């Protein structure tokens, strides 16, 4: 009888503990100020689409990830300025029988954070890899790596996408015959006034510049900023002042700092710095670049070295000085995002299937790993979406 009572007590305790754990997760998910983080993935493994988890910017705590919507190869994500819609590239080579990738529009459930597909449209090029929504919420701009094109897709009032209103093809090659045999548009960005768009092209060793008309949904060529041969510019980021632009160069593992003339829409190269430690002899390539919200630091991710390079920004000139490097706690940090408070970096590791949280030192800007990693197979993009 005593054994039976003891077993019953143990069972009751286990059930109670499980209930407490579950309630703690729910409480974390619903905590005021928490951020839903959407995760883009490649779906040729265990992942099935876009995942989401909750992040607490006060503590760095995270919840377990759940599938927000099933979709193919959503390798980059962007949020509508209203917070009601999310857009994702579908990194494929064929869509609706044509040689092109796709862009998907999703409605965000304000209660659960789950996504519902609204519609899909051709990206007007193979292998779409990056996109952005303008601040009017009227257009998606997308870069197609395989096709070497950039396009504008207008957005309806209900969040649905219309067919492309403007498509521009890049030209140029580089000395790296295996990677620069043709143009490879790898990103697209808007300046603060959204008068100009900028597209780093890995194949052409240039950042192409376009005059952007949000009302018409058009891109008009406006020159290009060259980089050193073989650089392979991949992504970019503007400084919060709008006076500088930083391009991260995948093939040479460098960051190029540009000054920016907003009136003319012109970039002028200031310097190029390495993201790797002195004497590094292994194989590595860069992926993402970001500027801290206060503009004091620039971060770049190294795949292979599996680190974040940290640079101090000279506020007067925009030039960079190396501050150090930190391991990211996973393999192949393809993407990372600075949380809206500027206190943390979240890093997505494509090959280890994890997402790390790193706390940023407010004085030095140096990241330090905290907590346990979030597990999402082939995580390649992180999109923090603060509650509205």
Regions found by a protein language model. Name each.
Residues 11-24:
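Bacterial N-terminal signal peptides
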Residues 30-55:
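An edge-strand/N-cap motif at the start of beta-rich repeat modules
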Residues 32, 46, 71-82, 124-139, ...:
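Beta-rich, blade/repeat-based domains predominating
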Residues 43-46, 92-96, 146-149, 204-205, ...:
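Short glycine/acidic-enriched loop and turn motifs that connect beta-strands
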Residues 54-60, 106-113, 153-162, 211-218, ...:
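Short loop/turn segments immediately following beta-strands, especially the blade-tip
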Residues 63-69, 117-121, 174-178, 220-226, ...:
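A short beta-strand motif characteristic of beta-propeller blades
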Residues 64-133:
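Blade-loop segments of beta-propeller domains
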